[in-house]
Amino acid sequence: DRDSCVDKSKCSKYGYYGQCDECCKKAGDRAGNCVYFKCKCNP
């Protein structure tokens, strides 16, 4: 679920958020983004 994406997904300092994005999509959200090195899902 989306909370596990926040914990699991690494957000690097150069904004690579593929892992976060993928996790959020699997959780049923539209996309994922990195905010202050944390993964956030966009419903």
Swiss-Prot record:
| Pfam family membership, one | Toxin_17
Sorted UniProt keywords: Disulfide bond, Ion channel impairing toxin, Knottin, Neurotoxin, Potassium channel impairing toxin, Secreted, Toxin, Voltage-gated potassium channel impairing toxin
Gene Ontology terms for molecular function: potassium channel inhibitor activity; toxin activity
Matches recorded under Gene3D superfamilies: Knottin, scorpion toxin-like
Q: Which SUPFAM superfamilies match?
A: Scorpion toxin-like
Q: Where in the cell is it found?
A: Secreted
**SS bond list:** 5-23, 11-34, 20-39, 24-41
Q: In which tissues is it expressed?
A: Expressed by the venom gland.
Q: Which family does it belong to?
A: Belongs to the ergtoxin family. Gamma-KTx 4 subfamily.
The protein's name = Potassium channel toxin gamma-KTx 4.1
Tell me the classification of the organism that encodes this protein: Eukaryota, Metazoa, Ecdysozoa, Arthropoda, Chelicerata
